[in-house]
Structure formats: C-alpha cells, structure tokens
Amino acid sequence: MAEAEEVKTMKILVTGFEPFGGETRNPSAEVVEHLPDTIAGAEIVKLILPTVRYEAPQRVAEALERYRPDVVLSIGQAGGRTAVSVERVAVNLDDYRIPDNAGNQPQEEPVVPGGPDAYLTNLPVKAMAEAIRAAGVPAEVSLSAGTFVCNHVLYSVRHYLERHFPGIRNGFLHIPYLPEQVLDKPGQPSMPLELSRRAVEAALTAIAGGNAAMPAGATGG
C-alpha cells in the first residue's frame, strides 16, 4: 500500500500598518492583531509594519526569509473609501500627499528604479471580493492602491518575490476608517472593526480555499 502523501499546511503572512498622518489608530493593525492563528486550515503569521517608505518592505523581506509563507496579504487603511477594496494593481510610483512616519515625501519617484510600470496581483481578487460580500461586508475590486506606502509595499514585495521567491503570491486589501476616526471628519465613511476583521477573514478563507490565481506577470516596461 502506498504511503499517504504529506499534506503541507498553507502559511499566510498577513501584515498591517502602524498609525500615520496624525492618527492614533490604524484599523489594519487592529484587524491583524485580532485575527486567529488559523483560518480555513491555513497558518496565519501576523506582522505590523512601520508606515515608512523603505523600512516597511524590508520588514516584509525579513519575514519572508524567516517564515517562507505561501502567500503575503497586506492590509492598509484607506480613508474615504466606503467598502473593502481588493487591490488588483501596484504601480511603480511614489507620490506622497503627506509624509510617511519618517518624514519621507517623495514626489513622482519610482518605487523601484528601472522596475516594470506595474504589477498585477496574482491572488484571486474577484473570488476574494465575492467572499467578503458573502460575509455581509461591502467589497469591491480596486484598480488603484494609491501612491503612498500601501502601494509601495504591494509593489516592492511583488518585485522582491519575482526575484527571490517566485512561487509566493501576494496581494493587498484596503479597509475604511474606524468609526472613532471620523468623529472629527464630517461626511467621511467608516466601518466597524468587527466588519473589517470579518472581511479579512473571508478574503483569507478564499485564498486558503484553493481559488485559482491570476497568471503572474508585470505590465509595462
């Protein structure tokens, strides 16, 4: 009788960001901290990143070397958005409206000089958005991760993976402000922490459930 084939447990590195822009809270960090250690059979490794241009992707690179995950899913705050955004594209552009937490404020500079104009994420973005909506949380597929540290991390991590760990996939979710963050921001939308956490768990379940990924690849030159 043949020996049973060993089933490898999927490992997903999930990252959030520290508060920035004068805020005292960042829902992405709080969601990551509240995630269980296992989701849909996948091991969840949690990491909070500094909201700093080059330091954030360096922390991810260190975690990649240490944990060797199958997937990296980064979470970030996107004030003004009304739904959870599953990002499809990372662009090779740093153009910061405000300084990061180290005072960096690049204008019209590349994330990686000489890198591709953009990368399409290789996670199942539509399946992730559908799973989030099925969990009762508004969600959309987004074509812009902005030009701040969130996009910088999405692009930099993918660029690093293409060169060092091409079998590892990565993607990004943007979540709205917390209700407490908009008390002094009339008209700004928000989402309770529990809903954002539910959305992230649903997206991770979709990833761990073996949904087919989009073909890997870059666009532009």
Can you annotate each of these PLM segments?
Residues 174-180:
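An accessory alpha-helical subdomain
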Residues 2-145, 158-167, 188-221:
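N-terminal catalytic or cofactor-binding beta/alpha core of small enzyme domains
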Residues 183-186:
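Short acidic, glycine/proline-rich loop/turn micro-motifs
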Residues 151-158:
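Hydrophobic, aromatic-enriched interface-forming segments
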